Amino acid sequence: MNILFCNYEYPPLGGGGGVINALLAEELATRHEVTVLTSQGLGLPAESVVNGVRVVRAPVFFRSQQAAANVPSMLAFLPMGIAAGKRLIKANRYDVINTHFVLPTGPVGAALARFGKLPHVLSVHGGDLYDPSKWISPHRHFVLRTWIKRLLRQADSLVGQSRNTIDNVHTYYDASLDVARIPLGIKRPAVDAARRADYGFTDDQVLLVTVGRLVARKAMDQLISVLKDTDRPDAHLVIIGSGPQEQALQQQSRELGVADRVHFMGQTDERDKFRLLQVSDIFVSTSQHEGFGLVYLEAMASGLPVVCYDYGGQTDFLTDGVTGHVVPLNDTALFTECCRKLISDREASQKISDRNLELVEDLYIENCARQYEQLFEDLIKKQQVQ
């Protein structure tokens, strides 16, 4: 197959949605021709080949951060992405288009599918449908809801990565739509012996670690409060990621008197991210919603128990008392108590760690890619018959 992916964000830009697209594209590129159409910014080249994937970047304007997008740059991607995509379709014979995120990428993928008369698979990731932390979340606005309904209905096939994402499609947009559930996956992490001393930590510290963009939806201010409330001076919080809330979080840690125990590691590469996970003790997340939550899989693959909230796609594979603790949304008192238990009971924590290493075996990228591959092939055959 010759596959064209469309995604507004693709590494190094953006967050988890771009990461999963890259993992999927790279896995499929081992046996197919794969091109990704994405946005250009921050000095990135207009075109490159990354791990066997041809990446074509349409120029956009006003993007100033690697981790977070803005409305002007998203709007600019619509005409620029369509123009770049049409040039690609004229020069190449693609078999299928897979668009990731109904907004802002959906209009680009839909236009290119019509232009090239190609089957169109639209993958929705959660935040493009529903984000409780944002006033501009599409589910709150009639015009955006109407636009999304149209894009969802136009696609030849829809994919959601979790029951929660599919529920949001049906609740806020169109209950009649058929949405395939294909769980996401991660790349199996390399065995890379890491030492705490490499990152300035000691063996007598208890490391709570989190990964994510420092934005409102991640609610990392709660984690800093949780750290203080554990009443464990040996507990430290390791934050991997960057974003617009970093200064406010640093100020909060100073005000609460825990600045010496909150460690902002910034945006790391994959190797350092997994090394930091491997030297930590517990993965924690107070994210208000995740369409799926790749970071939870990364934590499990690193042998960490997970403490998180019960709202989002992670509830498809995380179970309270089995993979760690799944806490009612925003119950910070219970969240803190669960962290205390795992810190205090190292034997129970180790059992959870061992179990998570077993459970994550079904959630690596090769399984996700096989399901997408089958969907693409079925859709192509269906179009050929018609």
Task: Enumerate the predicted regions with their spans.
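Aromatic "clamp/platform" in nucleotide-sugar-dependent glycosyltransferases that forms part
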Residues: Q288
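Helix-loop-beta element that forms the nucleotide-linked donor phosphate-binding surface
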Residues: I166-I186
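Short hydrophobic beta-strand element within catalytic cores of glycosyltransferases
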Residues: P305-C308, L318
